[in-house]
Amino acid sequence: MLQPKRTKFRKMQKGRNRGLALRGNQVSFGEFGLKSTERGRLTARQIEAARRAMTRHIKRGGRIWIRVFPDKPITQKPLEVRQGKGKGSVEYWVAQIQPGKMLYEVEGVSEQLAREAFALAAAKLPLSTTFVTRTVM
C-alpha cells in the first residue's frame, strides 16, 4: 500500500480540508479521468482497492495513473484507554481530497471500457466522482 518512505515528523495535526482543488484538477497523463466532486479523504487501502478493481477490468489493455498519494498520518489510541498520556500511534495514511481533484487516469482503452472500469473503482471510494475526458486546447 502507498505511504511515504520518510517523513520529517511522525504525527500530524488534524487540520481542515477546505477549498477547491487548484492543482491536479485536469487530465494530464491519460485520455480519461476519474474526478472527485466531493470533499473527503481516501485511505491507502481505498486507493489500492479501486486500483485493483480497475486493473482487473482493463486486463492487459491500457495504462493507469494514480494521481493522489496518502501523505497524512492518522493516529488512534487503543480501545479502552483513558484520555491523556500523549497522542496515539499512527494507524493508517490518508490523502485529503478537495472537489475537482483528479483521482485516476487511464490511457489506451476505449471510452466504454474506461467508463466501466471507473464505475467499478468509484464503487470502492467513499466520495462521489465523475468521468472526464481530456480536452485538447
UniProtKB/Swiss-Prot annotation:
GO molecular function, one term: rRNA binding
Any one cellular-component term (Gene Ontology): cytosolic large ribosomal subunit
SUPFAM superfamilies, sorted: Ribosomal protein L16p/L10e (SSF54686)
Cysteines paired by S-S bonds: none
Keywords: Ribonucleoprotein, Ribosomal protein, RNA-binding, rRNA-binding, tRNA-binding
Matching CDD domains: Ribosomal_L16_L10e (cd01433)
Biological process (GO), any one: translation
HAMAP family: Ribosomal_uL16
Subunit (UniProt): Part of the 50S ribosomal subunit.
Protein purpose: Binds 23S rRNA and is also seen to make contacts with the A and possibly P site tRNAs.
Family: Belongs to the universal ribosomal protein uL16 family.
Protein name: Large ribosomal subunit protein uL16
Organism: Marinomonas sp. (strain MWYL1)
